[in-house]
Amino acid sequence: MENLGFLIISTFLLLFTTLLPYSSASTTRRFHFNVEWKKVTRLCHTKQLLTVNGQYPGPTVAVHEGDIVEIKVTNRIAHNTTIHWHGLRQYRTGWADGPAYITQCPIRSKQSYTYRFKVEDQRGTLLWHAHHSWQRASVYGAFIIYPRQPYPFSGSHIQSEIPIILGEWWNDDVDNVEKAMMKTGAGAKVSDAYTLNGLPGPLYPCSTKDTFTATVDAGKTYILRIINAALNNELFVAVANHTLTVVEVDAVYTKPVHTKAIMIAPGQTTTLLLRADQLSGGEFLIAATPYVTSVFPFNNSTTVGFIRYTGKTKPENSVNTRRRRRLTAMSTVVALPNMLDTKFATKFSDSIKSLGSAKYPCKVPTKIDKRVITTISLNLQDCPLNQTCDGYAGKRFFASMNNISFVRPPISILESYYKKQSKGVFSLDFPEKPPNRFDFTGVDPVSENMNTEFGTKLFEVEFGSRLEIVFQGTSFLNIENHPLHVHGHNFFVVGRGFGNFDPEKDPKRYNLVDPPERNTFAVPTGGWAAIRINADNPGVWFIHCHLEQHTSWGLAMGFIVKDGPLPSQTLLPPPHDLPQC
């Protein structure tokens, strides 16, 4: 199975050479995804795994900035499915965004749907994944946008690129894991392994052969495209004996940041430069381990792979030499932070700044038209009568924003909005501030009432509005780092802090010069984060925690951007093959 690691790398090398790293030309690129079962073995455990085209991870979508993309998805399983193109803005094409019951009804068994959209003013590393129940545990892949212009990275010529997709593996059927969690009201069973490009590596049982390996030449520079497709865990990543240079996050160029390790949340991407500055013939660990802020059970293991330097070995000793090199690499200390190292996670996140050059300006709104402040909370709900619940104190776990636990409707919100048939589907009364003001991060999690309301509540803004959303963490049950993803828009993280947000003092300390531009960000443990959005994309857009367990519990909301005054500022009509509920 080690050959699978080389297969993934060679596929990317082929893309790197057939799709030039930059091009001013654009075209229509077509792909076909078959969602299907595939028998896969990991950790000495064989099971039917949900895949795209039988691949785990799924196929890479590689396009150029300005391309029109058509991806036909055929559902070959008995369950409904959808695919989300994570981080793609979908300007005026919300029908192609993918979250089930938000922008489309799911694709039914034996049916197909073609996602059509244009890649406009975006370049870099993104991802795609399933967006129905917990299918994205194995249905995911890289989405690479090559730029019109040369990379702005200074320094050495780029030799090639290496994709590294982080994931999780369960020996159990993940659908059953989710169902058990929702039935019992308890937390989900943790994964059995973390993976690098679908491979757990030699620290897990029966997995020496299932180890990711990338080959480099000494003296050359490589692009590492790091994608966190894990279901429920933020991760630290490092390469032994190497300094990494961050040059892009979430497909947006950044000022260079030199670091020994990174923290990356589910849904985030980080593009790094790795200079192969070690001696030929060596091997070095690349490792990922969780960043933990939760009191809930978690997988505390580490996945590793290898960066192998080319170099001649004597034929008669090649196997033994390779084994000795690998043992030496395994004994090398990797500069991974401690799993509880919030200080490092905070410092790293704060170090990321937008490039802010003349060619790639930072278009952060310096003034706002609307501010929404929302709490993000884990909740406990009373157990229904005649039912046993396994959550804390015999209750059920839920989650909420401003004490509203999001409920998906039985039909698409976008379609009902477009047809002006919202009655009974959703309402536009999401509270724009917490219903009660209290010490959000100092509350006693035992004595407080942690019940929540349920609903499909959104808020609405005018086209072109300059929107600020402040996400306030709470200490209900646990203070925790929440990675939140905004669909349909990039945003600027203008402020972050610990404790409670102060609307008078904290905005005075905002970074309105070069804040990081992202599509997914982490609200600090026991703190808050403020983002600003240029709301210039008409449609219905989902905001949710990218820890899938929390989304299932209701940690989500949505907002609507109304049509603008010009034809080019209006939502396009639905496609003819849009799935029906």
Swiss-Prot record:
Gene3D superfamilies, alphabetized: Cupredoxins - blue copper proteins
Family affiliation: Belongs to the multicopper oxidase family.
Q: Which domain of life is it from?
A: Eukaryota
Q: Which GO terms describe its molecular function?
A: copper ion binding; hydroquinone:oxygen oxidoreductase activity
UniProt lineage? Eukaryota, Viridiplantae, Streptophyta, Embryophyta, Tracheophyta
Per its UniProt record, what InterPro entries does this chain match? Cu-oxidase-like_N, Cu-oxidase_2nd, Cu-oxidase_C, Cu-oxidase_fam, Cu_oxidase_CS, Cu_oxidase_Cu_BS, Cupredoxin, CuRO_1_LCC
Residues annotated for Cu cation 1 binding in this entry: H84, H485
Q: What are the record keywords, sorted?
A: Apoplast, Copper, Glycoprotein, Lignin degradation, Metal-binding, Oxidoreductase, Repeat, Secreted, Signal
Q: What is its main location?
A: secreted
Which residues are modified by glycosylation?
N80, N241, N300, N386, N403
Residue positions annotated to bind Cu cation 3 are H131, H487, H544
One cellular component GO annotation, for this chain's record? Casparian strip
What the protein does comes down to:
Lignin degradation and detoxification of lignin-derived products.
Mention one GO biological process in which this protein takes part, according to its record. Answer: lignin catabolic process
* Signal peptide stretch: 1-25
Give the EC number(s) under which this enzyme is classified: 1.10.3.2
This chain belongs to the protein called Laccase-1
